[in-house]
Regions:
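Bacterial N-terminal signal peptides that target proteins for export
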Residues: 2-16
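Low-complexity, acidic/polar, glycine-enriched regions of mature
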Residues: 29-193
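Bacterial N-terminal signal peptides
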Residues: 17-24
């Protein structure tokens, strides 16, 4: 097969151009981060301003692609193992993991996948995405602080929170004095990979 060198060169330039365009619109330059083992992902439920119960997920899979110079290209996702939940009031474990709330026997994980990072100011971001809980997916917004760690350039200090209504995710409403609003929090550090 005898190819015209000009045609071959044009195809090469075209493919190179497509590759450059794809790299330009993907988070290719963003670094990959994972949560450190000391980070905490959990929730608290209050009633009349008093904390009724708090919980922390001990098994968390996480990844974030993030470049502070181009935060709009950032993305993050995490998966929480429901059975790894540790409660501030262990006596409520059966109720919290039961059918009326987490229904852990059927729904093994809670997950979040971002759809948009928005910079609000120095180290402040709004991370929109989809939270899946009990097989129900709803949009949520995490209000987030991501600050370079002063002692280690490979770490970002993070504090992030959102609030949901339990009944939006199929959890039984107004149960035994348990509040309808749930605060979900993440605090700790992201480590660059």
């Amino acid at each position: 097969m005898n190819l015209n060198p000009l045609v071959a060169m044009s195809k090469t330039k075209y493919l190179l151009g497509v590759a450059v365009m794809l790299l330009g619109i993907s988070p290719a330059y963003a670094e990959r981060w994972t949560l450190t083992s000391k980070s905490e992902v959990g929730f608290e439920i209050k009633s009349m301003g008093v904390q009724l119960v708090g919980g922390q997920f001990k098994q968390v899979q996480s990844v974030m692609h993030f470049d502070p110079t181009a935060p709009q290209q950032g993305s993050t996702q995490f998966v929480l193992n429901v059975d790894s939940l540790q409660l501030s009031k262990p006596s409520l474990r059966h109720m919290i993991l039961g059918e009326d709330l987490f229904h852990a026997q059927k729904y093994k994980t809670v997950s979040f996948k971002s759809t948009r990072f928005t910079a609000l100011g120095p180290d402040q971001y709004r991370i929109a995405g989809n939270l899946t809980l009990r097989g129900v997916t709803r949009p949520v917004i995490f209000h987030t602080s991501l600050k370079p760690n002063t002692g280690n350039p490979k770490l970002l200090d993070v504090q992030s929170f959102t609030q949901i209504q339990r009944s939006d995710f199929g959890m039984k409403k107004a149960m035994g004095g348990v509040g309808e609003k749930v605060n979900i929090q993440l605090k700790g550090q992201w480590r660059v990979q």
